[in-house]
């Protein structure tokens, strides 16, 4: 029996084949290559051997991060010789990892290496039009990941460990259910050497501490500890699928939409729903638990509160919960300090499109042949109609700015007298975090607010039966309104 046949019949190869079939990791009939993340360690070396034996077209990818001096160069030389031996194409990348980390604020050396590695893999994935990128994580790696996550506090997603497949098949882990014992036995029979990272013995590194100090204690409790945890991981994967199905079928698809507190309190596992809907806000579990406790109090539920997360805020407002990301908060801050003078009124007939931090403004002028229907024309809250000829006579100096002055008064069309701007914003359910950034059209000569975008307009320059030309100013927001209003703000009689 040839060595190849011996290796093909090895338990490692059988386990890899089962894993590939069970999770549908690879298309056996495809001629597209598989990118192998090859470090030169035992795991990735066995992975390359196994997939090559199973007949897949492999391209190896090796990164030299220059973090371990001569050892890094030794690894590169080893994988070069290995790929020559197996007749596998090798793609290499050399990185100044320390330089990358220092050039990117807040990025550790470990994070830098990860970003550089996956950027390189992604580039190869596109260049080769590859089936996928195969990673060498094995069963023991997954057990260690579970223990690390458990020590930090984790839910189902953290305790089910690494998945066999992620990013819709872009990354796969054919060894994820394979014991390292099989890996070492396979390499022994293949008479295949491998390299060892000297830092793997450093127990000041968290994963190494788990591997060398903590894991052996569990093995004393149960010699089949890895297999026991593997069974638990499979159960947790199923539970995660059930949880994801429940969340997906219960929550709105758009995470910018508000959650009604009364509705949330009636649901199963409301904390899990909060975690999912406001995932981009990155709120601590204790913060979300406090939020739920506050929502259980009917008096508090209707009042305003703000809950901080690492990625933004959640606001409790008028019986709803609304999330705003840090990116959106930054845009709102920019809009608060933004002021834009509109072009001279005489130039409006040519049309204009202007940029704003929260959207875009389009100005158009129409003549009587394009007038609204004789009875009623309804516009969105983001459109403003004015009599163009009245405007030309008055010649106001118009600008768009933020509603930062809470003491300002506005005379809305259809209402008696003047109303405080702050009250109009409250009545329109504008979130407190967004009020100061609400766009308004102001006549600089008189200080009059002509249009509070998305809320109301004044009676100035409104259309009449005598109107011959009219201008339409449209604000197209790029920031969705969580309390989208469908009020018909503009009703024009003819």
Whereabouts are the PLM-identified features?
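AMP-forming adenylation/ATP pyrophosphatase catalytic core
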Residues: 2-40, 63, 95, 116, ...
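Hydrophobic/aromatic-lined pockets within catalytic cores
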Residues: 151, 219, 278-282
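Repeat-unit-sized solenoid/scaffold elements
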Residues: 126, 210-218, 474-484
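Core alpha/beta nucleotide-donor-binding catalytic domains of modification enzymes
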Residues: 2-216
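Contiguous mid-protein beta-loop-alpha structural module that forms a pocket-lining wall or clamp
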Residues: 172, 177-264, 268-276, 321
